[in-house]
């Protein structure tokens, strides 16, 4: 216990547990929080844009990941600071809602914090800064709506969707194949989309990968690929017009659930037991054949004796198939999952035009292709690549492209990329600042400056002089009244993003601004940080 005095020299007692806690208050707390947020943004800043750098992250158990996906980088980083964890959550929210723009949203939040720090040092109250930021974000979101363009597409004319997905893939390690991968992503989304209701269920798209081959061998399969093979090497490798029994129950004689033992003291008794088990399993196989099944896919395993019997009775089977894959197979083939063997019937069988086993490489890795299904609303993107890291990064890139295509189907408004939308919003917010009397005007101007962080980072990562490039593009915006001018990252020779076909979804860009503002407001309102001491 200790005695201390407050600012009016009134004595108060500190309990021993409280003595052990460290505490930051007022401006010190806000500066510490801002510094933590800025440090996270600084890490991601170099990964922004088509010329952004990748990060290599090693997990405690030695797994190595190479990526430039903002959400993945922050997910794998070992972050202790609570404010830094907020930035990780921010990136995760953007990934969950939109799927793309996870790096940009953190860079923008870091820039907003940097500008807020300058205002706090000038004595402006954090609440006034937060209110100014809120006003500015509304102005920016409304301005994005006004400069957006409706992008018309149909099931036959998919070029607008492909171009927007290509913009997303430009910043990824797979950018050399961006056209092919964008087309695959768009076709996959359209296969599972309900265009009338503007609804897309991405769970119906399975992304599978296999080491070997090259990235260009990546394909879209109208059906399901399962990383399994037939349970017996002598079973047929190709089944046409397959009727599939999908079982989640054990495909073997039942075992008593209570504690039991069987005394066998003669050879005859053992043979009787074995014969009984064989007969029971024979009846199960016969029931499958009676209902018309030509292939059994089972969630559980069965022993080698059962496997041999299946081969003898000419009933191909696949064992140890995961629950998620079983669901997709059921959706694709129009079958029903059978939880109890007694419930198996002809109506519950799935139908597929072709089931084939395909071999890969010299090691004879095999996978099962279920194609020409009764219901085509379940597809698989099958990725090939030189190593596991490449395949994992391609999966992340494909996920972003799928999300962008989904967002365009839900809302077909686009804005132009390359930092053009941020520059246009910055000019609009700057112009609107004069209409707001009071201290908030400073915060609105600071918000406009913070929006410039995205084009500055794009220019810097592309090896261009950032400030010179930004001022030239800004003057172009004002002189020509052209909101399509952005940073020419690829040195094409024009900074008109319409000519370069660089597009981003409107809802993705609006969400970026709103989420970043929300988190920054939350951080600015923290004026007291109490943490337990380390000893």
From Swiss-Prot:
<dbReference type="InterPro" id="IPR054827">
    <property type="entry name" value="thermosome_alpha"/>
</dbReference>
<dbReference type="InterPro" id="IPR012718">
    <property type="entry name" value="Chap_CCT_epsi"/>
</dbReference>
<dbReference type="InterPro" id="IPR002194">
    <property type="entry name" value="Chaperonin_TCP-1_CS"/>
</dbReference>
<protein>
    <recommendedName>
        <fullName>T-complex protein 1 subunit epsilon</fullName>
    </recommendedName>
</protein>
<dbReference type="InterPro" id="IPR027410">
    <property type="entry name" value="TCP-1-like_intermed_sf"/>
</dbReference>
<comment type="subunit">
    <text>Heterooligomeric complex of about 850 to 900 kDa that forms two stacked rings, 12 to 16 nm in diameter.</text>
</comment>
<dbReference type="InterPro" id="IPR017998">
    <property type="entry name" value="Chaperone_TCP-1"/>
</dbReference>
<dbReference type="GO" id="GO:0016887">
    <property type="term" value="F:ATP hydrolysis activity"/>
</dbReference>
<dbReference type="GO" id="GO:0051082">
    <property type="term" value="F:unfolded protein binding"/>
</dbReference>
<dbReference type="InterPro" id="IPR027409">
    <property type="entry name" value="GroEL-like_apical_dom_sf"/>
</dbReference>
<dbReference type="InterPro" id="IPR053374">
    <property type="entry name" value="TCP-1_chaperonin"/>
</dbReference>
<dbReference type="InterPro" id="IPR027413">
    <property type="entry name" value="GROEL-like_equatorial_sf"/>
</dbReference>
<dbReference type="GO" id="GO:0005524">
    <property type="term" value="F:ATP binding"/>
</dbReference>
<dbReference type="Pfam" id="PF00118">
    <property type="entry name" value="Cpn60_TCP1"/>
</dbReference>
<dbReference type="InterPro" id="IPR002423">
    <property type="entry name" value="Cpn60/GroEL/TCP-1"/>
</dbReference>
<keyword id="KW-0963">Cytoplasm</keyword>
<keyword id="KW-0547">Nucleotide-binding</keyword>
<keyword id="KW-0143">Chaperone</keyword>
<comment type="similarity">
    <text>Belongs to the TCP-1 chaperonin family.</text>
</comment>
<keyword id="KW-0067">ATP-binding</keyword>
<comment type="function">
    <text>Molecular chaperone; assists the folding of proteins upon ATP hydrolysis. Known to play a role, in vitro, in the folding of actin and tubulin.</text>
</comment>
<dbReference type="GO" id="GO:0140662">
    <property type="term" value="F:ATP-dependent protein folding chaperone"/>
</dbReference>
<dbReference type="GO" id="GO:0005832">
    <property type="term" value="C:chaperonin-containing T-complex"/>
</dbReference>
């Amino acid at each position: 216990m200790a005695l201390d005095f407050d600012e009016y020299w009134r004595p108060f007692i500190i309990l021993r547990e409280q003595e052990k806690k460290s505490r930051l208050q007022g401006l010190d707390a806000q500066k510490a929080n801002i510094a933590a947020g800025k440090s996270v943004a600084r890490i991601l800043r170099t990964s922004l844009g088509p010329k952004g750098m990748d990060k290599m992250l090693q997990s405690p158990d030695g797994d190595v990941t190479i990526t430039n996906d903002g959400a993945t980088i922050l997910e794998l980083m070992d972050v202790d600071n609570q404010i830094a964890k907020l930035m990780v959550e921010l990136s995760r929210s953007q990934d969950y809602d939109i799927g793309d723009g996870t790096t940009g949203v953190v860079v923008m939040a870091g820039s907003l914090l940097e500008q807020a720090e300058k205002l706090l040092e000038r004595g402006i109250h954090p609440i006034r800064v937060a209110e100014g930021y809120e006003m500015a974000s509304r102005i920016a979101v409304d301005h994005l709506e006004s400069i957006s363009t409706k992008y018309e597409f149909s099931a036959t004319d998919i070029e607008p969707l492909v171009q927007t997905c290509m913009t997303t893939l430009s910043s990824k390690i797979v950018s050399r194949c961006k056209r092919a991968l964008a087309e695959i992503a768009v076709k996959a989304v359209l296969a599972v989309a309900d265009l009338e209701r503007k609804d897309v269920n991405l769970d119906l798209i399975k992304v599978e990968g296999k080491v070997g081959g090259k990235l260009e061998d990546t394909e879209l399969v109208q059906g399901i690929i399962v990383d399994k093979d037939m349970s017996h090497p002598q079973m047929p490798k190709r089944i046409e017009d397959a009727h599939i029994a999908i079982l989640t129950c054990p495909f073997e004689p039942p075992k008593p659930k209570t504690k039991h033992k069987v005394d066998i003291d003669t050879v005859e008794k053992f043979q009787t037991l074995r014969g009984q088990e064989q007969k029971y399993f024979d009846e199960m196989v016969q029931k499958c054949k009676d209902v018309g099944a030509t292939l059994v896919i089972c969630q559980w395993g069965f022993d080698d004796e059962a496997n041999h019997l299946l081969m003898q009775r000419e009933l191909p089977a696949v064992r140890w198939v995961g629950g998620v894959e079983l669901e997709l197979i059921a959706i694709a083939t129009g079958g029903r999952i059978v939880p109890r063997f007694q419930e198996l019937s002809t109506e519950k069988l799935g139908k597929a035009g072709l089931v084939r086993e395909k071999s890969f490489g010299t090691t004879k890795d095999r996978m099962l292709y279920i194609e020409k299904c009764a219901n085509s609303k379940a597809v698989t993107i099958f990725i090939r690549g030189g190593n596991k890291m490449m395949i994992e990064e391609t999966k992340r890139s494909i996920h972003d492209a799928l999300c962008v295509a989904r967002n365009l189907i839900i809302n077909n408004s686009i804005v132009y990329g390359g930092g053009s939308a941020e520059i246009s919003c910055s000019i609009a917010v700057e112009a609107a600042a004069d209409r707001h009397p009071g201290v908030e005007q400073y915060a609105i101007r600071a918000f406009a400056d913070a929006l410039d962080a995205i084009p500055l980072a794009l220019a810097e990562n592309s090896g261009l002089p950032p400030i010179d490039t930004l001022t030239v593009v800004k003057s172009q915006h004002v002189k020509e009244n052209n909101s399509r001018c952005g940073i020419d990252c690829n040195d094409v020779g024009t900074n008109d993003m319409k000519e370069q076909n660089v597009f981003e979804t409107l809802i993705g860009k609006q969400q970026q601004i709103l989420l970043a503002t929300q988190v920054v407001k939350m951080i600015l309102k923290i004026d007291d940080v109490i943490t337990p001491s380390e000893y």
